[in-house]
């Protein structure tokens, strides 16, 4: 059973720098975002349960860290949240709708409002620009607005402003014309995150996005998470790095043994957890 902690204190002519991250204030006209929630999720493979009775939510304009040791079901949870698989039990809700109760066409439209970058960095053998543009090109089959925005994208001499913004957010605009195959692992992950951000999702799911990366790339990705949050995107981060969770997240959910046993404001979860197992885990005394 999850212990939910209440939030504490609810309360000139100069040429622009092309590599600078976009100003969140400039995005005031963006449509409002929606929340993503899981209710009593259960899922397994064969006879074994991987997840049991998981309930959590990520709100627009916040970063939720889902922490737990490797192999505890975080990736499976994120695949369910991204609607790649249907849960055996419980519901996934976007904007209050149970996505698996929606007609298929509506569910696919809702799915496209959720961006995800996996721990395994998979890019196409094209340029950085074309990789980031991919998500927009997929969307044009169902959205006239996006279709008009990206029509002829690959034939342009300059990348679209949408692609520019996404690459600025992850600090990769200077690599826009590079072949993706020439990037380092950290640079490739940053491009994958830019690709997830380009369609302006309501929700961004990041599964261990900085695993085995150097400090420079880790810092750039953490900066991108904060920028996405400042744009009103609901950001969920799966990580076993508790220090990272403390640096970037507003709230934290702790997964142990396939169950969410505590969630709440990050400082409260780490400094005064209600569950003894969480206390032992954050102190490095509990091993799964």
Curated annotation (Swiss-Prot):
<protein>
    <recommendedName>
        <fullName>Probable anion import ATP-binding protein HVO_1886</fullName>
        <ecNumber>7.3.2.-</ecNumber>
    </recommendedName>
</protein>
<dbReference type="InterPro" id="IPR003593">
    <property type="entry name" value="AAA+_ATPase"/>
</dbReference>
<dbReference type="GO" id="GO:0005524">
    <property type="term" value="F:ATP binding"/>
</dbReference>
<keyword id="KW-1003">Cell membrane</keyword>
<dbReference type="Pfam" id="PF00005">
    <property type="entry name" value="ABC_tran"/>
</dbReference>
<dbReference type="InterPro" id="IPR017871">
    <property type="entry name" value="ABC_transporter-like_CS"/>
</dbReference>
<feature type="domain" description="ABC transporter">
    <location>
        <begin position="36"/>
        <end position="282"/>
    </location>
</feature>
<feature type="binding site">
    <location>
        <begin position="68"/>
        <end position="75"/>
    </location>
    <ligand>
        <name>ATP</name>
    </ligand>
</feature>
<keyword id="KW-0813">Transport</keyword>
<keyword id="KW-0472">Membrane</keyword>
<comment type="function">
    <text>Part of an ABC transporter complex involved in anions import. Responsible for energy coupling to the transport system.</text>
</comment>
<comment type="similarity">
    <text>Belongs to the ABC transporter superfamily.</text>
</comment>
<dbReference type="InterPro" id="IPR003439">
    <property type="entry name" value="ABC_transporter-like_ATP-bd"/>
</dbReference>
<dbReference type="InterPro" id="IPR027417">
    <property type="entry name" value="P-loop_NTPase"/>
</dbReference>
<dbReference type="GO" id="GO:0005886">
    <property type="term" value="C:plasma membrane"/>
</dbReference>
<dbReference type="GO" id="GO:0016887">
    <property type="term" value="F:ATP hydrolysis activity"/>
</dbReference>
<dbReference type="GO" id="GO:0035435">
    <property type="term" value="P:phosphate ion transmembrane transport"/>
</dbReference>
<dbReference type="GO" id="GO:0005315">
    <property type="term" value="F:phosphate transmembrane transporter activity"/>
</dbReference>
<keyword id="KW-1278">Translocase</keyword>
<feature type="compositionally biased region" description="Basic and acidic residues">
    <location>
        <begin position="1"/>
        <end position="18"/>
    </location>
</feature>
<feature type="region of interest" description="Disordered">
    <location>
        <begin position="1"/>
        <end position="33"/>
    </location>
</feature>
<keyword id="KW-0547">Nucleotide-binding</keyword>
<comment type="subunit">
    <text>The complex is composed of two ATP-binding proteins (HVO_1886), two transmembrane proteins (HVO_1887) and a solute-binding protein (HVO_1888).</text>
</comment>
<keyword id="KW-0067">ATP-binding</keyword>
<dbReference type="InterPro" id="IPR005670">
    <property type="entry name" value="PstB-like"/>
</dbReference>
């Amino acid at each position: 059973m999850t212990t939910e902690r209440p939030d504490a204190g609810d309360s000139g002519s100069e040429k622009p720098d092309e590599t600078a991250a976009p100003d969140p204030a400039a995005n005031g006209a963006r449509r409002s975002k929606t929340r993503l929630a899981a209710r009593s999720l259960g899922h397994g493979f064969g006879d074994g349960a991987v997840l049991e009775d998981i309930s959590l939510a990520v709100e627009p304009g916040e970063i939720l860290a889902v922490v737990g040791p490797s192999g505890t079901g975080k990736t499976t949870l994120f695949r369910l949240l991204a609607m790649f698989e249907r849960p055996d039990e419980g519901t996934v809700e976007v904007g209050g709708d149970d996505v698996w109760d929606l007609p298929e066409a509506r569910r696919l439209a809702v799915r496209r409002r959720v961006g995800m970058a996996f721990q395994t960095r998979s890019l196409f053998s094209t340029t950085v620009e074309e990789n980031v543009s991919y998500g927009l090109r997929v969307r044009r089959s169902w959205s006239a607005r996006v279709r008009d925005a990206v029509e002829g994208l690959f034939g342009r001499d300059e990348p679209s402003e949408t692609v520019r913004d996404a690459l600025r957010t992850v600090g990769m605009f200077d690599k826009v014309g590079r072949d993706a195959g020439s990037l380092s692992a950290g640079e490739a992950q940053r491009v994958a995150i830019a690709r997830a951000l380009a369609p302006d999702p309501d929700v961004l799911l990041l599964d261990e996005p900085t695993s085995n990366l150097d400090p420079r790339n880790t810092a750039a990705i953490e900066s991108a998470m904060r920028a996405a949050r400042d744009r009103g995107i609901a950001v969920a981060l799966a990580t076993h790095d508790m220090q990272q969770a403390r640096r970037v997240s507003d709230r934290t959910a702790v997964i142990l043994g396939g169950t969410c046993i505590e969630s709440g404001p990050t400082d409260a979860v780490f400094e005064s957890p209600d569950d003894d197992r969480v206390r032992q885990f954050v102190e490095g005394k509990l091993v799964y």
